[in-house]
Amino acid sequence: MARRRSCQLHQVISLFTFAVGVNICLGVTANRIKRAEGWGEGPPTVLSDSPSINISGSCKGRCFELQEAGPPDCRCDNLCKSYSSCCLDFDELCLKTAGGWECTKDRCGEVRNEDHACHCSEDCLARGDCCTNYQVVCKGESHWVDDDCEEIKTPECPAGFVRPPLIIFSVDGFRASYMKKGSKVMPNIEKLRSCGTHSPYMRPVYPTKTFPNLYTLATGLYPESHGIVGNSMYDPVFDAHFNLRGREKFNHRWWGGQPLWITATKQGVIAGTFFWPVVIPHERRILTILQWLTLPDHERPSVYAFYSEQPDFSGHKYGPFGPEMTNPLRDIDKTVGQLMDGLKQLKLHRCVNVIFVGDHGMEDVTCDRTEFLSNYLTNVDDIILVPGTLGRIRPKFNNHAKYDPKVIIANLTCKKPDQHFKPYLKQHLPKRLHYANNRRIEDVHLLVERRWHVARKPLEVYKKPSGKCFFQGDHGFDNKVNSMQTVFVGYGPTFKYKTKVPPFENIELYNVMCDLLGLKPAPNNGTHGSLNHLLRTNTFRPTVPEEVTRPNYPGVMYLQSDFDLGCTCDDKAEPKNKLDELNKHLHIKESTEAETRKFRGSKNEIKENVNGNFEPRKERHLLYGRPAVLYRTRYDILYHTDFESGYSEIFLMPLWTSYTVSKQADVSDIPAHLTNCVRPDVRVSPSFSQSCLAYKNDKQMSYGFLFPPYLSSSPEAKYDAFLVTNMVPMYPAFKRIWNYFQRVLVKKYASERNGVNVISGPIFDYDYDGLHDTQDKIKQYVEGSSVPVPTHYYSILTSCLDFTQPADRCDGPLSVSAFVLPHRPDNDESCNSSEDESKWVEELLKMHTARVRDIEHLTSLDFFRKTSRSYPEILTLKTYLQTYESEI
């Protein structure tokens, strides 16, 4: 995407430490940032395993200091454990647990004991180190959770707070459906949800793994953009491996984009620690955040984060449906309660904004449901597979002469009737995944069916001495799968009160967090303003992008004899002058403005035409305004009875074609004498028209129509559908998909939704970066043809959200479904494509569902420009993904 190029800005960090298994330690402090421009193509700079540190210093008065001490001084910040640089007394002074984490009646008014983890003495409030329930137990106050919901219309902050602080409470592996357990298991989280702003779920990025998603939350970038494409990965330029246990993950060269804490620091806002090593108890993390909130104004951070390894750890071990999951969820809720009680104790509960958010969901998975590549390939020892809930394949040895990704794909495609994975070249993956444009993403990718794993061979799964499976749950699947969805709750003075919002993608949260802090976001993949409806007041107001190229409105009629395109449309059932009448009809219909126009008559004399067609009389088919072209080019607006097009003089095909299909519309067959009909369009110069001869001479390529002749409103209007300006190149295999979509599915959706508006067109993304290819870029991939072959075709179907209202008379919210269909010479993606189209085409469309924003980036077009809805509402519509999944 256009913003995706921000991966070349790389503000990077050395932040992650992982313990064995899934116990995660992630962290950064405000001063621990290194700058790199790009991904460090030069020699690697690996962190030393044994830095020269004098650990004999002391942490007295320094526990969890925000400033990182540099060598040779020892450290007392939250990450010193990760870097083996803590002072000798760090555990003794900073990780105290004596006395427990709560006040009891017996402890109220106790004599201060400096060995205690937190205090219940009379002076603890003044010193900012009370246990979080001190006021409740010792002073008779109520727990935050027991108070009624209150609408906080303006922040109520103590003097010195220039902005409401933001606390990000992130939980690993929190499946969205866990929220159904409600207040009996999670009363504090449920109160945040019911009193604040929440969505039914939040969609993670693909792959639905921890590292990619935590860093996406921090940067607003897709993994292909920020570079963390998995929990483990190989960079062929670095010739280095990144994984959870190795030290290479500390190297800043892997981390792209600009995370929130860098955005804050660069704009003069202090950021606290973002993630915490697993050795630091949750209670200590909360108490530390609360203590930071009491720092002097010039030291106090404005943004904080808490990170919990649960419920992911238990979800892997027991599965998402195991009864053992209840206690980990109770523990998380207890920690949330400690935070909220602590904020109330500091009189900050009406001041601070809190985001409770997950990184991904969890699915029921066991070893028994594993596909082994050894059952498909004879050479599994020659490949490296990143296994599990997705598969990434590369050769075992670099520059392996016999390794061919296409051969691997062929040997894995549709080999068994019960196959539980689907192989793709990465450029053929659904565009909605945004998982291709990075050298760390292997050429061969396996999308694995939910609840299944993939491995090279059985030994690599059952390798434990017991031979038993050691997990019951996992994640990483397609990010539209309902079990992969996670939680989002926003609570505080800036969030709306008791508000439910539609689901959204986690790439959008970075912009929201910047808005909450009054920051200007760095370039990112989110759509700034699309989540304005979450907030009580909006500091950012998005504006409609400027149109770069305005269209032409053809004013010259060419003679039929001017065309020698090899196109015929013989209709022996009609009078001889039928086509001449149809051509005149093309020129004058849908006209309004009395503009003098000139056209060439049958004898080349100049004639006057006072009925110009500069604008349509009624926006019958462009219900939401004409799409804007956001790059320099040349294109014409062509009006017809049943559709309108923006015809490219560069690509010799429409950039878009729009039409509206009513619920009552009929689907008619094409008469036999018109099955091969293609008409020249006398409004467009022959030099800007396709040649039908090219298709006759190319047996591998056919053509289709963007407006379907099947939906023509009359026999006369049907001829418009056969114009060469409605024609696009299509592989014969793809025509089966396109024709079924137009003939059957469009009518089906129109019937179900009380009419739909359809906009369809070509996509050119030869370099699979998710962006519209320029003409020069296309020439690099397409030689010897004036008509480039699209890599994909898109279609956007819009109706009224309230199906009782017709699509063309909708005065309420809109509903949209969009598709980006790969244009390929075969239908191997669907293993049953030899069957009737009714058995497989719609499922293929659902796999390639997309957001309107995806299509806008792929085409450099801007849709929905003329509507009564607010622009933020339109952005919300554009960023919505129809997943076709069952309710969570």
Curated annotation (Swiss-Prot):
Protein residues bound to 1-tetradecanoyl-sn-glycerol 3-phosphate: 210, 231, 312, 475
Q: What positions does the entry give for 1-(9Z-octadecenoyl)-sn-glycero-3-phosphate binding?
A: 210, 231, 312, 475
User: Which residues participate in 1-hexadecanoyl-sn-glycero-3-phosphate binding?
Assistant: 210, 231, 312, 475
Instruction: Name the Gene3D superfamilies on file.
Output: 4.10.410.20, Alkaline Phosphatase, subunit A, Extracellular Endonuclease, subunit A
- Cofactor binding comment, as recorded: Binds 2 Zn(2+) ions per subunit.
Reactions listed under catalytic activity = a 1-O-alkyl-sn-glycero-3-phosphoethanolamine + H2O = a 1-O-alkyl-sn-glycero-3-phosphate + ethanolamine + H(+); a 1-acyl-sn-glycero-3-phosphoethanolamine + H2O = a 1-acyl-sn-glycero-3-phosphate + ethanolamine + H(+); 1-(9Z-octadecenoyl)-sn-glycero-3-phosphoethanolamine + H2O = 1-(9Z-octadecenoyl)-sn-glycero-3-phosphate + ethanolamine + H(+); a 1-O-alkyl-sn-glycero-3-phosphocholine + H2O = a 1-O-alkyl-sn-glycero-3-phosphate + choline + H(+)
Q: What class of enzyme is it?
A: hydrolase
State any GO BP term from the record: immune response
Cell compartment(s), UniProt: Secreted
Keyword line? Calcium, Chemotaxis, Cleavage on pair of basic residues, Disulfide bond, Glycoprotein, Hydrolase, Lipid degradation, Lipid metabolism, Metal-binding, Obesity, Repeat, Secreted, Signal, Zinc
The secretion signal range is 1-27
* A GO cellular component annotation in the UniProt record: extracellular space
- Which residues take part in binding Ca(2+)? 765, 767, 769, 771, 773
Which residues does the annotation list for site: Essential for catalytic activity? 878
Q: Which SMART domains match?
A: Endonuclease_NS, NUC, SO
Sugar-modified residues = 54, 411, 525, 832
| E.C. number | 3.1.4.39, 3.1.4.4
Ranges that cross the membrane:
none
Recount the PTM note.
Answer: N-glycosylation, but not furin-cleavage, plays a critical role on secretion and on lysoPLD activity. The interdomain disulfide bond between Cys-414 and Cys-831 is essential for catalytic activity.
**Record text about domains:** The nuclease-like domain is most probably catalytically inactive as residues that are essential for catalysis in the DNA/RNA non-specific endonucleases are not conserved. However, it is required for the stability of the protein and the catalytic activity born by the Phosphodiesterase domain.
Record's protein name: Autotaxin
This protein's species is Bos taurus (Bovine)
> Gene encoding this chain?
ENPP2
